[in-house]
Amino acid sequence: MERDFLGLGSKNSPITVKEETSESSRDSAPNRGMNWSFSNKVSASSSQFLSFRPTQEDRHRKSGNYHLPHSGSFMPSSVADVYDSTRKAPYSSVQGVRMFPNSNQHEETNAVSMSMPGFQSHHYAPGGRSFMNNNNNSQPLVGVPIMAPPISILPPPGSIVGTTDIRSSSKPIGSPAQLTIFYAGSVCVYDDISPEKAKAIMLLAGNGSSMPQVFSPPQTHQQVVHHTRASVDSSAMPPSFMPTISYLSPEAGSSTNGLGATKATRGLTSTYHNNQANGSNINCPVPVSCSTNVMAPTVALPLARKASLARFLEKRKERVTSVSPYCLDKKSSTDCRRSMSECISSSLSSAT
């Protein structure tokens, strides 16, 4: 079939397309007009409708089979023929297959199918001719049989590819405001908290953290033991049965011998003051010290510590005696001392 669009080509140039459809099917195709889609770039005459209805001369020339010359120019069939062939594609493999000879693959132009309605593509062939092709019926021209209409590369207009709306529509409109507090590894959530209350809580928390914390030292209280006994007259009891409590004073005087051993020689004793109420109860003891400047410790030393201290002193005494320069027996040391004292006394008497 040969078509001349916009007077750019002559009618003498041969063009051939192998058609296997009848003329009755071409007549049944709807004769539509196409509006020029580039009206804002060309002259006012482009707003007219371009008819694709085949003429009588074209129908007579379609009855024969022609070969496409290797001139580099190629013109597709009319829109009505392509539309009619795509409608009859599913009937049979013979009627639905359309073959296009591949004259020159480097000089062919293929239109990309677009799914938008009313969109037309305008191409210029290498030979100088221009043609219009409907994108809904565009087919590749490389000699491949076409069994189905082309697939669109763009989504339909109704589909939504992406959106930038805030995803808060799923939340209910009247949802209560919540306050979440993270403190000491725990999470606390409170409902119905207004922004003003939240700000006030944050201010209180900030002010509370800046306030200095005053810690009072823990007070140690002595345990007071109350002894409850029957009515017993303390004056009738012998003094040996009276309880006594002894305290070791750190400031007490101590006697030291020549070997460096120390012995505690002073202690404090306390007696019970009996304040009998109705002759039945005995109150706690009150310590009485001989001197006011000596303070008795609150806790007495245990007996085990006393025994270990005594053993330590004995061991130290033994070490000191073994290291002394005059390692003599006790008897010899006493004899030497006596002889020295006698010599000193005799010398003093002779001097006088």
Curated annotation (Swiss-Prot):
Transmembrane segments: none annotated. InterPro entries: CCT_CS (IPR018467), TIFY/JAZ (IPR040390), Tify_dom (IPR010399). The keyword Calcium does not apply. A motif (Nuclear localization signal) lies at residues 304-311. Induction: Up-regulated by jasmonate, wounding and herbivory. Keywords: Jasmonic acid signaling pathway, Nucleus, Plant defense, Transcription, Transcription regulation, Ubl conjugation. GO terms for cellular component: nucleus. GO terms for biological process: defense response; jasmonic acid mediated signaling pathway; regulation of defense response. Residues 1-71 are annotated as: Disordered. Ubiquitinated. Targeted for degradation by the SCF(COI1) E3 ubiquitin ligase-proteasome pathway during jasmonate signaling. Residues 172-207 form the Tify domain. The tify domain is required for homo- and heterodimerization and for the interaction with other TIFY proteins. Repressor of jasmonate responses. Jasmonoyl-isoleucine (JA-Ile) specifically promotes COI1-TIFY6B/JAZ3 interaction. Acts as a negative regulator of MYC2 function. Feed-back regulated by MYC2. This is Protein TIFY 6B. The lineage of its organism: Eukaryota, Viridiplantae, Streptophyta, Embryophyta, Tracheophyta. The gene is TIFY6B.
